[in-house]
Curated annotation (Swiss-Prot):
InterPro entries: ExoRNase_PH_dom1, ExoRNase_PH_dom2, ExoRNase_PH_dom2_sf, PNPase/RNase_PH_dom_sf, Ribosomal_Su5_D2-typ_SF, RNase_PH, RNase_PH_bac-type, RNase_PH_CS. This is Ribonuclease PH. Its EC number is 2.7.7.56. Keywords: Nucleotidyltransferase, RNA-binding, rRNA processing, Transferase, tRNA processing, tRNA-binding. Homohexameric ring arranged as a trimer of dimers. Phosphate binds at R86, G124, T125, R126. It holds the Pfam family RNase_PH. GO terms for molecular function: 3'-5'-RNA exonuclease activity; tRNA binding; tRNA nucleotidyltransferase activity. It catalyses: tRNA(n+1) + phosphate = tRNA(n) + a ribonucleoside 5'-diphosphate.
Length: 238
């Protein structure tokens, strides 16, 4: 039995609220159960130095957690003057994942930065950030079209992500913190709405996992992510 009472294949309740903040071209509050992340998409009329003159755009991401988003207060990384390795890893993952959603040549020389700020953490913050960040990105792209800075949206496909793992010997979908902290295997799966995999990150915390467990986890991920695509679609049509 999972601590939350959910069945192995049952994800947490997910809510996606668009236009959550006033100033950004795209903004979303995404909630995976008790995990809550604000994702904003900001457009700039410039590209990184390595892309200047190439006629291509860029999608990048930044990630952070509020000091009291967890059970005990964490010091701000800005106060320490250095980002931690986990933060750098996660924001690179978010950026890689969301670049797969967009035709960067069709984006032109624009940079879109997805800022993901965790206001409450209960496991799965990076997968929530990718799922909500994609919706914020779509709104930012549509803003560029509305402002006639692009003729049409360069969106190629939607992207969503979920965590899966093996908890007390059973493959489960969308781990919350109590499960994540005890899981024998923890995996993050990022997919497109066309059925392709963007990234699979999996680690055995105890005993190695078997092929059958891997197959079961990927099947759970695909099913849960299909539900996320429906929720993204509903949010964008609202």
């Amino acid at each position: 039995m999972r601590p939350s009472g959910r069945t192995p294949e049952q994800p947490r309740d997910v809510r996606i609220t668009r236009n959550y903040t006033r100033h950004a071209e795209g903004s979303v509050l995404v909630e995976f159960g008790d995990t809550k992340v604000i994702c904003t998409a900001s457009v700039e009329n410039k590209v990184p130095p390595f892309l200047r003159g190439e006629g291509k755009g860029w999608i990048t991401a930044e990630y952070g957690m509020l000091p009291r988003s967890t059970g005990s207060r964490m010091g701000r990384e800005a106060a320490r003057g250095k980002q931690g390795g986990r933060t750098v890893e996660i924001q690179r993952l978010i950026g890689r994942s969301l670049r797969a959603a967009v035709d960067l040549e069709a984006l032109g020389e624009h940079t879109i930065t997805i800022d993901c700020d965790v206001i409450q953490a209960d496991g799965g913050t990076r997968t929530a950030a990718i799922t909500g960040g994609c919706v914020a990105l779509v709104d930012a792209l549509n803003h560029l079209v509305k402002e006639k800075r692009l003729k049409k949206s360069p969106l190629k496909q939607m992207v969503a992500a979920v965590s899966v793992g093996v908890y007390r010997g059973t493959p489960v979908a969308d781990l919350d913190y109590p499960e994540d902290s005890e899981a024998e295997t923890d995996m993050n799966v990022i997919m497109t709405d066309q059925g392709g995999f963007i990234e699979i990150q999996g680690t055995a915390e105890g005993a190695p996992f078997e092929q059958a467990e891997l197959d079961a986890m990927l099947a759970l991920a695909r099913k849960a992510i299909d539900q996320l695509f429906e929720l993204q679609k509903e949010a964008l049509s609202a």
